[in-house]
Curated annotation (Swiss-Prot):
It is found in: Cytoplasm. This is tRNA1(Val) (adenine(37)-N6)-methyltransferase. PROSITE patterns: N6_MTASE. It catalyses: adenosine(37) in tRNA1(Val) + S-adenosyl-L-methionine = N(6)-methyladenosine(37) in tRNA1(Val) + S-adenosyl-L-homocysteine + H(+). The keyword Metal-binding does not apply. Its EC number is 2.1.1.223. It comes from Serratia proteamaculans (strain 568).
Length: 260
């Protein structure tokens, strides 16, 4: 029997902005801290990119699929108005519990609800509710299992295939909504092709490389069910030759990273 729990956050922060200093056991942002010691997948550049880049439009209901530590949900809470509600769905109970704790510590504790359950079950009860859906999904095909089952589930597509992810998004999204993902570049190409086959349209695409002279290694996609009036495709190099961040990357993350 599938064990489920839903965490309703009920603590109100007394300040809209926090003056954070770096802490151990997680990642410190300008307005919030993300502990990730109980999560299989730690805070990384992929999640930060998606949280900072995802187009918001006029989204009132937001869903983060496979939320992990709650990183992307927290970033989107920072970027949106006080009336925007965010649901974060995470299959792993330890990660969901840590996401819950991270939300409680944040300034947006009334706006984020963490659900520890399978997205397929969640979709059955929340069909057609979300203007914006985001996901930093697993992408490795089944192979040699990790010793850590939670890490295996977070990295491999056995618990959430990309076809199943698209099907869930189709069920959950409103007709004019946007579904955003971040994936390795080659896997993202296949994901985009499959999405088009299923009736999705690419509204925005961001191709990411470590440096301007290196191959693209990540792609961020914003998909819609309706054809985009004007689809856009951009490139982003994260670092310069000397290892420092590019101006484009700094602009993207300036509201989040402590020292920019």
């Amino acid at each position: 029997m599938l064990r489920q729990f839903c965490i309703q956050v009920v603590i109100v922060s007394t300040q809209s902005k926090a003056n954070f200093t770096p802490r151990r056991g997680g990642f410190t942002f300008k307005q919030f801290f993300v502990a990730h010691d109980r999560c299989a997948m730690k805070v990384g550049t992929d999640g930060v990119l998606l949280g900072a880049w995802a187009p918001l439009a006029q989204a009132q209901r937001v869903l983060d699929i496979g939320s992990g530590s709650g990183l992307i949900a927290l970033m989107l809470a920072q970027r949106t108005a006080e009336n925007v509600q965010i649901d974060a769905v995470e299959l792993d109970e330890a990660a969901a519990a840590q996401a819950h704790d991270n939300v409680l510590e944040s300034p947006w504790s009334l706006r984020i609800q963490v659900h520890a359950q399978d997205i397929h079950h969640f979709a059955q009860h929340h069909a057609g509710q979300y203007d914006l859906i985001v996901s930093n999904p697993p992408y490795f095909e089944p192979a040699v299992a990790c010793r850590d089952q939670a890490r295996h589930n977070a990295r491999y597509t056995e618990t959430l295939t990309h076809d199943a992810l698209l099907a869930s998004a189709e069920q959950l999204i409103v007709p004019q909504g946007t579904f955003c993902v971040v994936l390795p570049h080659d896997i993202g190409e296949a994901f985009e092709t499959n999405a088009h086959r299923r009736g999705w349209h690419t509204a925005q695409r961001l191709n990411v490389s470590d440096r301007a002279d290196t191959p693209m290694h990540r792609v961020l996609l914003a998909l819609t069910r309706q054809p985009a009036e004007e689809a856009t495709e951009q490139k982003l190099a994260i670092k310069l030759a000397d290892g420092s961040y590019t101006d484009d990357f700094r602009r993207l993350i300036t509201d989040f990273y402590l020292f920019y």
